[in-house]
């Protein structure tokens, strides 16, 4: 039987600003990526997100970002190796404080937004993130784009790596994600997205935006929780995976 993790980026409200349907989404995923304050999230939101994750038996992961609240972490920044490492460590530490207080552990770490996209192609940046994780806790799984520079960096730092694929994003011919700024970057057809997910899991392939067949590995599927259809979408994905006899379970159970 195929096994796959279903993850979502949550805990992205802060202050008076509310985002997503975290309480509902957490009923359907196996892992959650928790914003750590640099692109979204705040101490109270982190606390509540972990409470909800614990109630639903969902594993937690740190979701570090560039320091970019105004741009939601989606703007690229030129930072040094040490800055990248320290920003990641700082955010890991923030999540760890809440996790420890609640008797929980950090299962994985997944970079957010522009930091994620840059680390997928810049091995030096990926190495900085992996060094931060390895120095913090070598048992934490590094979650990143399938067949990217992050995979190689994790190997070099002795970390377990989970290959992530996206249900609602289009791919370039080189396996990177199509920029959100471009037409066709987001897949709005739920049935098409589900078919693509099943193909990625069972055949280890996806069709790029230009029609090219790309090889990849699907350990974890990301379903975004920041749009109006997110809840129905994640419900349908879970239902269809079960129909295909694909077991949904957290990364720690098979990576």
Curated annotation (Swiss-Prot):
Protein name (Swiss-Prot/TrEMBL): 5-oxoprolinase subunit A
Keywords: ATP-binding, Hydrolase, Nucleotide-binding
PANTHER family on file: 5-OXOPROLINASE SUBUNIT A, UNCHARACTERIZED PROTEIN YBGL-RELATED
Subunit text: Forms a complex composed of PxpA, PxpB and PxpC.
Gene3D superfamilies for the chain: Glycoside hydrolase/deacetylase
Domain of life from the UniProt record: Bacteria
Function summary: Catalyzes the cleavage of 5-oxoproline to form L-glutamate coupled to the hydrolysis of ATP to ADP and inorganic phosphate.
Taxon lineage: Bacteria, Pseudomonadati, Campylobacterota, Epsilonproteobacteria, Campylobacterales
UniProt-listed Enzyme Commission number(s): 3.5.2.9
Keyword Zinc-finger: no
């Amino acid at each position: 039987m195929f096994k796959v993790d279903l993850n979502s980026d949550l805990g992205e409200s802060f202050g008076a600003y509310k985002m997503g349907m975290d309480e509902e989404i957490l009923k359907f995923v196996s892992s959650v990526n928790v914003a750590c304050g640099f692109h979204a999230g705040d101490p109270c939101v982190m606390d509540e997100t972990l409470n909800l994750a614990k109630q639903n038996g969902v594993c937690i992961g740190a979701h570090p970002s560039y320091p970019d609240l105004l741009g939601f972490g989606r703007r690229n920044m030129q930072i040094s190796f040490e800055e990248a490492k320290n920003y990641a460590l700082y955010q890991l530490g923030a999540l760890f404080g809440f996790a420890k207080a609640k008797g929980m552990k950090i299962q994985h770490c997944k970079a957010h937004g522009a930091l994620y996209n840059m680390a997928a192609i810049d091995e030096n940046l990926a190495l900085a993130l992996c060094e931060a994780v390895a120095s913090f806790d070598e048992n934490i799984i590094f979650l990143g784009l399938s067949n990217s520079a992050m995979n190689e960096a994790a190997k070099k730092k002795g970390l377990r790596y989970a290959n992530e694929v996206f249900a609602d994003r289009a791919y370039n011919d080189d396996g990177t994600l199509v920029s959100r700024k471009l037409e066709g970057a987001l897949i709005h057809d739920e049935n098409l997205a589900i078919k693509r997910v099943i193909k990625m899991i069972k055949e280890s392939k996806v069709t790029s935006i230009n029609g090219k067949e790309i090889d990849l590995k699907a350990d974890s599927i990301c379903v975004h929780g920041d749009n109006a259809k997110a809840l129905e979408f994640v419900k349908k994905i879970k239902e269809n995976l079960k129909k295909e006899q694909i077991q949904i379970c957290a990364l720690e159970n098979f990576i």
